[in-house]
Amino acid sequence: LDLGFEKFIELLEGAHEIDEHFCDAPLEKNAPVILALLSVWNCTFLGAQSQAILPYDQSLHMLSAYMQQAEMESNGKSVTWHGKEIDYPTVPTIWGEVGINGQHAFYQYLHQSNNVVPADFIGSVESVTPVQGHHETLMANFFAQTQALMQGVDETQVRADLKAKGRTDDYINKVAPHKVHKGNRPTNTLLMKRISPRTIGSLIALYEHKIFVQGIILQICSFDQWGVELGKGLANEIEKELRESSNKLNQDSSTAELINYFRKVKREVA
């Protein structure tokens, strides 16, 4: 909206394009369906406990937070729409960061942790930054990371590389195990022509339809948030007690102690 209402219309038009694709495309070519199937496979069948959203464009720096809210609030359930308790994983923890920031923060974990984290890499062909050569450097890292996560590097290759660099056998024996990357880490690559209101609208709709399909496959209702509602109801009662001075609290012992401590410190600093 800050860019003008016409840009907001473009965002809606981009979303509508994915709406039509979702309705019309056959299942084997339906992008939201394919993404949903991959997510269910990785989480429910292979046991992946989290998924990373990694956009390589600063204008998408809030995308991972939005996807976290959209997917975890929609599908973070443990009961089917028939009221039966679910005995299988439903949704992973969604998290992420702009690509280059993430490379210097948690990519080590993605590459060599014993927890496999599926990741969505999101980039564009055209740059929106007028800095000469910047986008090619950025996208070189983009493609390199997905390649490294897919292929990895085994100990034989590590030893050969170190030997070619003139390292001693003693050094190679010590370092080689630490440089092994097992690879076979699942990633999706979403490559847009250019980051724009239209493509952002399409991207958001793509993920929202994917979340809906996941809910259908998992047999859960994606459109309620009773877990959130429980906390809101409790907060209303606790807020009254925080504002009162009565020592009698209608709370469990743990919460009562925390409330009493809060009120005590508040009186001291008043």
Where are these regions (language model features)?
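Short, flexible segments with low predicted structural confidence
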Residues: 42-43, 171, 202-203
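Short, intrinsically disordered low-complexity segments
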Residues: 158, 166, 173, 184, ...
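Short secondary-structure boundary micro-motifs
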Residues: 27, 36-37, 172-175, 199
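Active-site phosphate/pyrophosphate-binding segments
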Residues: 1-132, 140, 152, 181-183, ...
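Intrinsically disordered, low-complexity segments enriched in polar/charged residues with Gly/Pro
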Residues: 29, 176-177, 212-213
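Acidic, Ser/Thr-rich peripheral helices and adjacent loops at domain boundaries
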Residues: 130-170, 176
